[in-house]
């Protein structure tokens, strides 16, 4: 009965989405925006029903109910509870239900908490969100039913892919889906604004928190996924330019451009049409990623579906949503008047340059991702790998980082080139010093891109904190700290990428217990092989010690694991982290002569890559807390920022509109 209840909740949510769409259409065509009061409870009920449906699927996985086909093919009765829980979305159908649930809850949040938009724009936004949700409901119910029964029911189940049996599964996919859905909400805002001819700064301020939240979540998801692949797959790399990796990167690039564009629109009332177009592009990249993962055209640890009919369904949704949005854009573009103008030397111009460069990178990654698939469709196999992306997209990415550092040092509207050059003097000096230092230490021993990466990272790090110079730090707004930390995080990640590419040392040996392996100043002693067992796996563990210089030996334990359900051999790398890098050890197979394959990497400063990613997400979070709308009104309580006050100073108003007006007047006077 649990499965039937979950399916019924899903059908009812789909019916409510259809009702929501109908109410919005009727309200807009009859000019009755007051129908928004009727749309809100429908959106709320839809969110509750999708959450209920997903909770029931989680219950089926935790109970190991093998009478449900999805549980039988993606779980096992002997699996630890964490992987039963996370395994709910470690498959095509479950992950799509998670997607639909997040979309339903997002629609509920827009219905309940959005108060800045005009009522007709708000209603049109909810209609667009209902339209998107309806398509995914149809996809789930007609081609990917997560509650289908297994007949006959197996006793234990087939088990989850061992590569997915990692705590990363509990964090990486959900954060990506949350980010994708956030972009769908931004898309709905854009469609709603076009339908009601309401593209202005107020609309941008309403949309910006969703874009920022989606961008933060995508940043966290990509960072977590990169580290998960790094330590789980045992190949020593953190990004392979896999098509499905690119499928998450492309929405992030579009969201980054959109975030900067909507900031210009929200604060300076410029770039109206460009912001709408970027909102469409960002969501379209999410849909492209969905198609790549679920169409069956890719074979990857990331890919779910092998049914081309599902890919056709998603392709139809992509054509409907994006084609419809572009048609609407072309129809309404004449009504979208550009707002305030700005001079060539201005922060707005720097943000436009940032947008254009990010768009170039997005286009290059999209071409490199889709070109092999298109040529294969015509019978020709072409491989596009890291050399293409590194050599083509890498230099543009470095230019983006430079523009990112210069932008905050330029004034809004109009500035003087000489004044901007003066503010960039210190970062430029640091960049030249870094050039000299790296040249002395590594000239001729590293590639051009890593060399430039190290040099630019130093200059950008200084440029990122430059907005704090000569400021009263106690009175600096929280969103400024967020911007500084996020930009500094980009420099930190760039330094980690460049150092890893330039200075990584790799050694592959065949060793017996008792052997000592020396590489990059480390001594790794291979002591013994010990059989061990886990909840649903057995392993041969390499007992080793690692030491450097006069330091004490440290135990490390790489493993060669075997999972019985399904039967799979995997490796578990041993990682030893130090301030200046990470020792990465992988135990391979045993040869006939009793020697074991051991692969060792010393990867200087590689952890800066993920530290920088977390700093970027932290900076985005501070900006979200400190800047968005500078006030929050919900349940009759109003909180507003006073722009001139110290960081974190809030002025709280009461529940009556009179107090709200007082606070608003104080902010204006300030």
Residue ranges and their predicted role:
Residues 1-34, 45, 52, 66, ...:
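Contiguous transmembrane helix-bundle modules in multi-pass membrane proteins
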Residues 508-599:
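Soluble non-transmembrane domains of integral membrane proteins
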Residues 1-9, 32-37, 59-93, 145-173, ...:
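Membrane-interface interhelical loops and short amphipathic "cap" helices
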Residues 11-17, 21, 95-226, 234:
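A conserved hydrophobic secondary-structure block that centers on an alpha-helix together
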Residues 29-51, 112-134, 195-216, 241, ...:
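Membrane-interfacial loop-to-helix junctions in multi-pass inner-membrane proteins
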Residues 213, 223-230, 236-237, 243-288, ...:
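Conserved active-site neighborhood of enzyme catalytic/cofactor-binding cores
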Residues 53-72, 93-100, 104-107, 141-148, ...:
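Transmembrane-helix bundle segments that line or gate the permeation/cavity pathway
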Residues 2-85, 93-123, 135-146:
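Extended, highly charged clamp/arch subdomains and adjacent linkers
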């Amino acid at each position: 009965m649990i499965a039937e209840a979950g399916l019924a909740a899903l059908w009812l949510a789909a019916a409510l989405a259809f009702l929501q769409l109908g109410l919005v259409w009727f309200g807009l065509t009859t000019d009755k925006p007051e129908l928004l009061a009727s749309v809100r409870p429908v959106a709320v009920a839809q969110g509750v029903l999708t959450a209920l449906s997903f909770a029931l699927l989680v219950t089926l996985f935790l109970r190991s109910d093998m009478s449900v086909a999805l549980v039988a093919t993606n779980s096992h009765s002997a699996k630890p509870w964490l992987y039963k829980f996370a395994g709910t979305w470690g498959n095509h159908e479950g992950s799509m239900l998670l997607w639909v649930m997040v979309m339903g809850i997002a629609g509920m949040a827009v219905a309940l908490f959005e108060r800045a938009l005009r009522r007709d724009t708000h209603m049109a936004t909810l209609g667009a969100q209902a339209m998107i949700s309806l398509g995914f409901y149809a996809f789930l119910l007609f081609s990917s039913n997560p509650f289908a029964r297994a007949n006959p029911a197996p006793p234990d189940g087939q088990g989850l892919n061992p590569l997915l049996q990692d705590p990363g599964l509990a964090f990486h996919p959900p954060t990506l889906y949350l980010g994708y859905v956030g972009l769908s909400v931004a898309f709905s805002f854009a469609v709603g604004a076009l339908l009601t001819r309401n593209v202005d700064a107020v609309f941008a301020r309403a949309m910006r928190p969703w874009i920022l939240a989606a961008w933060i979540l995508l940043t966290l998801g990509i960072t977590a996924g990169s580290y998960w692949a790094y330590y789980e797959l045992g190949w020593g790399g953190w990004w392979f330019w896999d098509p499905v990796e690119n499928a998450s990167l492309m929405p992030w690039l579009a969201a980054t451009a959109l975030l900067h564009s909507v900031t210009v629109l929200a604060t300076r009332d410029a770039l109206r049409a460009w912001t709408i177009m970027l909102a469409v592009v960002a969501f379209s990249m999410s849909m492209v990623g969905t198609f790549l993962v679920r169409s069956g055209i890719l074979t990857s640890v990331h890919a779910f579906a092998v049914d081309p009919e599902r890919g056709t369904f998603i392709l139809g949704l992509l054509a409907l949503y994006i084609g419809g949005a572009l048609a609407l854009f072309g129809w309404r573009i004449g009504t979208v008047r550009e707002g305030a103008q700005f001079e060539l030397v201005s922060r707005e111009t720097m943000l436009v340059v940032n947008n254009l460069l990010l768009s170039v990178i997005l286009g290059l990654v999209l071409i490199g991702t889709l070109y092999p698939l298109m040529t294969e469709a015509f019978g020709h196999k072409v491989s596009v790998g890291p050399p293409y992306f590194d050599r083509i997209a890498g230099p543009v990415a470095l230019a983006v980082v430079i523009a990112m550092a210069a932008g905050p040092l330029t004034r809004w509207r109009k500035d003087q080139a000489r004044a901007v050059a003066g503010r960039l003097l210190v970062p430029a000096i640091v960049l030249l010093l870094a050039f000299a230092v790296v040249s002395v230490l590594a000239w001729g021993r590293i590639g051009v891109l890593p060399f430039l990466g190290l040099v630019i990272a130093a200059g950008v790090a200084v440029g990122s904190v430059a907005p704090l110079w000569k400021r009263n730090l106690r009175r600096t707004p929280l969103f400024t700290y967020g911007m500084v930390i996020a930009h500094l995080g980009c420099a930190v990640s760039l330094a980690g990428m460049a150092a890893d590419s330039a200075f990584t040392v790799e050694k592959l040996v065949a060793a017996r217990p008792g052997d000592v392996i020396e590489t990059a100043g480390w001594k790794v002693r291979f002591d013994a092989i010990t059989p061990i067992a886990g909840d649903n796996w057995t392993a041969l563990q390499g007992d080793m010690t690692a030491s450097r210089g006069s330091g004490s030996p440290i135990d490390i334990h790489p493993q060669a694991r075997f999972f019985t359900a399904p039967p799979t051999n995997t490796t578990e790398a041993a990682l030893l982290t130090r301030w200046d890098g990470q020792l990465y050890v992988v135990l391979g197979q045993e040869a006939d002569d009793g020697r074991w394959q051991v692969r060792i990497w010393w990867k200087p400063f590689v952890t800066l890559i993920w530290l920088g990613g977390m700093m970027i997400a932290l900076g985005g979070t501070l900006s979200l807390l400190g800047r968005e709308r500078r006030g929050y009104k919900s349940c009759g309580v109003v909180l507003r920022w006073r722009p001139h006050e110290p960081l974190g100073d809030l002025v709280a108003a009461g529940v009556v509109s009179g107090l709200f007006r007082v606070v608003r007047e104080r902010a204006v006077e300030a």
